């Protein structure tokens, strides 16, 4: 089976839905758009897309099989990711209104930081494994992995950009200190809530 047009279109829809729906990346981009603006959030966006591209390729080239052989590695990675996500939620919750000088000194998540985060992002792993296991034909497998990863990246970048843009549009609405604090606490809470699948699995 080759990567037909029908299969590619089906995958493109999968990539769009999973990229644009809420998750840790998009929640952080929305908060970054509000706190730093769109332009300063661009490295964060590019880091997400490039880091995710590498993750999909790695899963396709055998990293998934390594985790099946050594499940403890995957478990450790997931809990490290959960701990990092809680740290990011804490940072967002405590990022209050800033003066112009404070905004210039404060730093949004960097390109490398966003790229590295994909390796501990539970939703990114689910997306990558789903793409490889469901939409990658075995005939011409390695070429298809690259195509799948590239198409995912092409769709992912504008999808996550929508969230950063929405955050930027909200800046004028959230000039009031109280509303901005409530917004940041809300975004932090959503990040914590995004860990519920891991918690359910841990206690099941």
Predicted ranges, named:
Residues 88-92, 155-161:
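Transmembrane alpha-helical segments that form the membrane-embedded catalytic/substrate-channel core
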Residues 157-172:
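Transmembrane alpha-helical segments of integral membrane proteins
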Residues 2-75, 127-152, 162-164:
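Juxtamembrane transmembrane-helix termini in multi-pass membrane transport proteins
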Residues 118-123:
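Selected transmembrane alpha-helices and immediately adjacent juxtamembrane segments
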Residues 135-142, 176-182, 203-204:
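Extracellular loop architecture of rhodopsin-family
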Residues 40-110, 166, 173, 186-189, ...:
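Membrane helix-loop-helix hairpins that form the core translocation module of multi-pass transporters
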Residues 2, 196-204:
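Juxtamembrane boundary at the C-terminal end of a transmembrane helix
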């Amino acid at each position: 089976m080759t990567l037909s047009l029908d299969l590619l279109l089906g995958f493109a829809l999968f990539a769009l839905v999973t990229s644009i729906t809420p998750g840790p990346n998009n929640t952080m981009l929305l908060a970054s758009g509000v706190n730093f603006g769109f332009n300063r959030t661009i490295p964060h966006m590019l880091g997400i897309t490039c880091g995710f591209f590498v993750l999909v390729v790695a899963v396709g080239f055998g990293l998934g099989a390594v985790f099946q052989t050594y499940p403890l590695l995957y478990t450790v990675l997931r809990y490290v990711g959960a701990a990092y996500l809680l740290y990011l939620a804490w940072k967002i919750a405590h990022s209050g209104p800033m003066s112009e000088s404070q905004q210039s000194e404060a730093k949004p998540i960097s390109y490398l930081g966003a790229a590295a985060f994909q390796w501990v992002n539970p939703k990114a792993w689910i997306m990558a494994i789903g793409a490889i296991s469901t939409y990658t034909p075995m005939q011409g497998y390695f070429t298809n992995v690259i195509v799948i990863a590239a198409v995912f990246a092409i769709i992912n970048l504008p999808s996550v950009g929508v969230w950063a843009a929405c955050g930027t549009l909200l800046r004028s609405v959230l000039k009031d200190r109280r509303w901005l604090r409530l917004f940041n606490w809300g975004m932090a809470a959503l990040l914590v809530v995004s860990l519920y699948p891991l918690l359910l699995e841990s206690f099941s």
